[in-house]
Swiss-Prot record:
GO terms for cellular component: endoplasmic reticulum; endoplasmic reticulum membrane; Golgi apparatus. Glycans are attached at residue 215. The keyword Transferase does not apply. Interacts with slp1. InterPro entries: Tatp1. The chain crosses the membrane at residues 166-186, 303-323, 367-387, 415-435, 480-500, 558-578. Belongs to the TAPT1 family. This is Endoplasmic reticulum membrane protein 65. The keyword Endoplasmic reticulum applies. It is a multi-pass membrane protein. It holds the Pfam family DUF747. GO terms for biological process: protein folding in endoplasmic reticulum. It comes from Schizosaccharomyces pombe (strain 972 / ATCC 24843) (Fission yeast).
Length: 649
């Protein structure tokens, strides 16, 4: 190829771009004002034995970058600039020949700059017919991309991976919830016995001036048990006067848009209460609040101050959960599908708020814990609503018909399947897209399970420091509001139980009175409000609901149910402990290879939101083996749905 061979000082623009296409192929000037004879490359004759491709090329756009203004280059004289500006830049097209054996193109004609082989291979569209042929015959083959194939595999594998973590967290939440109704009453009895012994020893040493025991103070774990019992009992008494039926009809009378706003407000209030309540209860159960001298007034003032704040939180959070249950009950019992559609659309909006954001592993762990807690809360709400609707159905049913039939079960359970099914679908879709956009492998959820297993095993190994049980420690990390859920369950269950008992007693009295008036063999007739006669067979009354109510009514029945609940709690806790120990041993073996796990937790944890993320857990979660290679995304290759910053817009 030809090149400029003029001596003297080179142009400033050309000295900066000596390797550029412009400085190599455009004409250059000397400072003396004479044109430099540009060397035009000689036309090489193509080999006729080799096939060639002739492509017409347009004028290069790089010719426009050659500036000749004297104001920009003051060293040049006016004559030099004028002579340079006189040189025309032709728009004629040249023909480039490509040979199979020669990598450099041969330029013929008046050519401003050489072009690459890729640019030369593109056909110039000269008329409309060529454009049509180009559109119809263009090659639309997409090159293979292993990263996108991996994205699709991870997207499809995410639901199975998250369900294993969600299922473990859900069972831990059930174990923590059953703990309050089974083992916690036994711990309270032990705490009362310990308190009585401490009081007796104190009185004995006071009156007889003897030191019967070197340590007469109540252990901190027993104080926490008594405080929990006092909080649950006080909250249940304060919310007892709330008329749930009246609240139900007030919410049901609202318009759909108000109902939608109310549901969102309650959901936000629930999360805020969870974030604040855990800190409040931790302050109340802390060592410096409970460890003070009995005769110290300042210690008592601090204790009552935090107890009042904790009680206010318990009442507020219980009311929020109660309103959520009533709102969900209105949705389930609504004859219009619009309300249920609003509820499901509210769950789908959750995808928009979470998917198009950048997630670190710590944030994904917090989101996973939040979803586990939300799923468990929905389970408790569904059970409460089902029992409530069952009591209403038992109140309005006739005596000669069974309480539960296939048709009634379908009517009762169909809305719950819609609610729970939509929740599962939203969780799967949300986490799958988060995994895709943030270049994370689904194996990260296995590490989340390892973190929860570590908490369970570590709390069980340190029995002297654990005051709330193994499952309670895991529930505390996940942010599960166990005490407010227990309070709202007690409040609704007591009302449902009273409805069952009163309805059953009323039906028995009606059957006896009608049987006395109309004695016909085994059949007794009573009249419904709609004046339709029905036959009631007293000999066949022993249905499952009647048998259950007769058993539970006595003290022996209550003791039997309590024993069954304790056995269920112990079996579930033992199964969870076996799973966590096996995973913990394998986790230690895995982490010893990569040296990314420390076995002892630090005393001061770092809180982010209401889910705990300390430095050790953060280092454990940030493991490079769970990452996918993140390609660099310059502006020319940036795609619409690629996570480049903190959010996808």
């Amino acid at each position: 190829m030809g090149s400029n061979t003029s001596p003297g000082q080179a142009d400033p623009l050309e000295s900066e771009n000596e390797s550029s296409l412009t400085s190599r192929f455009l004409p250059n000037k000397r400072d003396g004002g004479k044109d430099n004879e540009s060397v035009i490359p000689e036309k090489e004759e193509p080999d006729l034995n080799e096939p060639v491709l002739a492509v017409p090329l347009p004028k290069s756009r790089y010719a426009l970058t050659k500036r000749s203004s004297s104001s920009e280059y003051p060293r040049r004289s006016a004559s030099t600039s004028a002579k340079k500006n006189v040189i025309p830049i032709t728009r004629s097209y040249s023909t480039t020949f490509f040979s199979k054996t020669n990598d450099q193109p041969t330029v013929t004609g008046n050519q401003d700059k050489p072009i690459s082989r890729l640019r030369a291979s593109k056909l110039q569209i000269q008329n409309f017919w060529n454009y049509i042929c180009f559109e119809l015959l263009a090659n639309d083959t997409v090159p293979a991309n292993p990263i996108k194939e991996k994205h699709v595999e991870n997207f499809l594998a995410t639901p199975y991976a998250i369900e294993k973590t969600f299922l473990f967290g859900w069972f831990v939440s059930v174990d923590s919830f059953l703990y309050i109704f089974t083992l916690f009453p036994i711990r309270v009895l032990i705490s009362f016995f310990t308190l009585s012994r401490c009081i007796f020893q104190g009185l004995f040493s006071t009156f007889f001036h003897r030191n019967s025991s070197p340590n007469r103070s109540l252990p901190r774990s027993r104080k926490i048990d008594l405080l929990k019992l006092l909080l649950i009992f006080s909250t249940s008494i304060l919310i007892r006067k709330i008329d749930v039926s009246r609240l139900y009809h007030i919410i049901r009378a609202q318009a759909s848009i108000r109902f939608y706003v109310l549901y969102n407000v309650l959901e936000i209030a629930d999360r805020l209460c969870c974030a604040l309540g855990q800190d409040v209860l931790d302050c109340l159960f802390s060592n410096h609040i409970l460890s003070f001298n009995f005769w110290n007034p300042a210690g008592w003032m601090t204790f009552f101050y935090y107890f009042a704040i904790s009680l206010a939180y318990m009442v507020l959070h219980t009311l929020v959960l109660l309103y959520q249950i009533i709102t969900l009950n209105v949705t389930v019992n609504s004859y219009s599908n619009a309300v249920l559609a609003l509820l499901m659309s509210n769950q789908l909006v959750e995808i928009k708020g979470a998917v198009f954001k950048k997630f670190e592993k710590e944030n994904l762990f917090q989101l996973t814990c939040s979803d586990v807690v939300e799923r468990f809360q929905i389970t408790i709400m569904v059970i409460i609503i089902f029992l409530r609707n069952l009591a209403e159905l038992y109140t309005t049913s006739s005596l000669d018909q069974p309480l539960l039939t296939f048709k009634r079960l379908k009517t009762l359970l169909a809305p719950f399947f819609w609610v729970i099914g939509s929740e599962l679908f939203v969780d799967w879709l949300k986490h799958a897209f988060i995994i895709k956009f943030n270049y994370i492998k689904p194996s990260i959820y296995s590490r989340f399970t390892d973190v929860l297993c570590h908490d369970y095993v570590a709390s069980g190994a340190q029995l002297t420091q654990t005051v709330t049980g193994c499952s309670q420690q895991v529930a505390r990390r996940m942010g599960l509001p166990v005490l407010p859920l227990v309070c709202v369950f007690i409040r609704t269950s007591m009302q449902t139980w009273s409805m069952f008992r009163s309805t059953h007693s009323m039906k028995q009295e009606i059957a006896k009175s009608i049987g006395t008036i109309f004695p016909t063999k085994d059949n007794y007739v009573y009249y419904l409000p709609n004046k339709e006669a029905n036959t009631y067979n007293a000999g066949k009354e022993a249905s499952w609901e009647t048998l259950l109510l007769s058993v539970v009514r006595g003290k022996s029945g209550i003791a039997f149910l309590f024993f069954m609940a304790i056995m269920l709690k112990l079996l579930l806790g033992k199964a969870i402990l076996a799973i966590t120990q096996s995973r913990y041993e394998s986790m230690q073996q895995r982490e010893e290879k990569i040296n990314s796990w420390e076995r002892e937790r630090k005393a001061n944890n770092f809180f982010r939101g209401h889910i705990e993320i300390d430095k050790k857990t953060k280092d454990f979660l940030n493991n490079s083996k769970d990452d996918l290679p993140v390609p660099k995304s310059p502006l020319l290759t940036l795609e619409r749905y690629a996570m480049h910053s903190k959010r996808i817009w």
